[in-house]
């Protein structure tokens, strides 16, 4: 198994273990802060989010790419609240048993923010709302429609929950939707569901949501994401990629899990950056339309750029720190758009 392997977990009961010392991150996780014009764009993005009383997954999930994305004018908006009704062990988003009512003004606020930021591509993600009969599907649809009505030229990507496996709610959400991308993350390999995710989530349930989305709307690109460093083996990543591709998933991202705090799931390993290139090439060989793979890659990281590259409308901009491949035509050899820069 390549990369930096962390010590095996102790069999001592958690309550009796000494508090572990957090491992120093490998050198390839170094990032730079924005300055000059990029700092000004970062500040403008931050102000647009604050002025419209919105939440972003960039902030709530403590994403390591926040400076890079916000300095480029990119942001992933989080709707339906800032706290989730589930408690996955990897996630920095807050958990709440009884969520507050949905904000009826949120669709309008979201549309205003997207308009003011002059985005080409907007990613909208959600918290789980198991307290709602439709898991929030109708609210998500209203938010998407509001943005499209205000800015029809902006491509839209929804990073959706599993909607508690409700295919009727999914059908309502996707009917007539202007979405370019429907994304839902399986997060980890199937064997690790109980270790990593909330007990109400599973790889199989997530896979069926992705499969059904493609059946309902074959014109919409489907997308998912895998984390590494949560206890998986290299071959399990390959197996999970096969399952996702067989479900009709078009785009995939692979990135390193980083524990938000000592209270979250501990990091198991740090694969070497070159391993992400291996997975990327495997994914394209399986028939995925595109992949971004690298330690700092997250499902929404430069999502618009990956979409444009997949559609062959963007060839100049690169994704430093990621191995990015797209299949230009069926049965083509993989086309590397840029190598990893660390």
What are these regions (language model features)?
Residues 130-133, 190-196, 260-266:
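A short acidic, helix-capping loop that chelates divalent metal ions and anchors anionic groups
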Residues 80-87:
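Short pre-active-site segment immediately N-terminal to redox-active cysteine/selenocysteine motifs
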Residues 122-142, 231-236:
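Conserved glycine-rich "GG(E/T)P / GGGxP" loop and the immediately following alpha-helix
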Residues 96, 127-129, 161, 186-189, ...:
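Short, ordered loop/turn segments at secondary-structure junctions
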Residues 164, 182-203:
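Acidic/histidine-rich catalytic cores of soluble enzymes
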Residues 95-122:
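Conserved alpha-helical substructure of the radical SAM core
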Residues 1-76, 80, 92, 108, ...:
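Auxiliary Fe-S-binding modules of radical SAM enzymes
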Residues 119-125, 178-190, 247-258:
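Non-cysteine beta-strand/loop elements that form the S-adenosyl-L-methionine
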């Amino acid at each position: 198994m390549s990369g930096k392997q962390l010590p095996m977990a102790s069999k001592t009961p958690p309550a009796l273990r000494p508090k572990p010392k957090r491992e120093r991150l490998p050198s390839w996780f170094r990032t730079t802060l924005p300055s000059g014009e990029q700092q000004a764009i970062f500040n403008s993005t931050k102000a647009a989010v604050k002025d419209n009383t919105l939440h972003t997954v960039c902030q709530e999930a403590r994403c390591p790419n926040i400076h890079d994305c916000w300095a480029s004018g990119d942001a992933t908006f989080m709707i339906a609240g800032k706290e989730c009704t589930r408690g996955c062990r990897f996630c920095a988003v807050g958990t709440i048993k009884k969520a507050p009512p949905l904000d009826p003004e949120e669709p309008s606020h979201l549309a205003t923010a997207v308009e003011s930021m002059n985005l080409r591509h907007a990613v909208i993600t959600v918290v789980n709302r198991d307290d709602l009969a439709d898991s929030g599907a109708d609210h998500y649809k209203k938010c998407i429609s509001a943005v499209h009505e205000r800015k029809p030229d902006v491509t839209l990507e929804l990073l959706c929950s599993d909607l508690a496996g409700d295919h009727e709610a999914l059908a309502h959400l996707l009917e007539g939707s202007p979405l370019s991308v429907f994304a839902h993350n399986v997060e980890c390999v199937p064997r690790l569901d109980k270790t990593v995710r909330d007990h109400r989530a599973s790889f199989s349930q997530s896979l069926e949501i992705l499969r059904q989305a493609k059946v309902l709307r074959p014109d919409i690109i489907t997308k998912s994401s895998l984390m590494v460093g949560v206890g998986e083996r290299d071959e399990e990543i390959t197996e999970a990629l096969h399952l996702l591709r067989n479900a009709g998933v078009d785009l995939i991202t692979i990135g390193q899990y980083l524990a938000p705090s000592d209270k979250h799931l501990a990091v198991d390993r740090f694969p070497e950056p070159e391993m992400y290139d291996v997975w990327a090439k495997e994914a394209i060989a399986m028939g995925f339309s595109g992949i971004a793979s690298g330690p700092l890659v997250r499902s929404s990281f430069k999502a618009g750029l990956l979409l444009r590259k997949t559609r062959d409308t963007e060839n100049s901009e690169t994704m430093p720190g990621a191995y990015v491949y797209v299949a230009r035509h069926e049965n083509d050899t993989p086309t590397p758009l840029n190598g990893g820069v660390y």
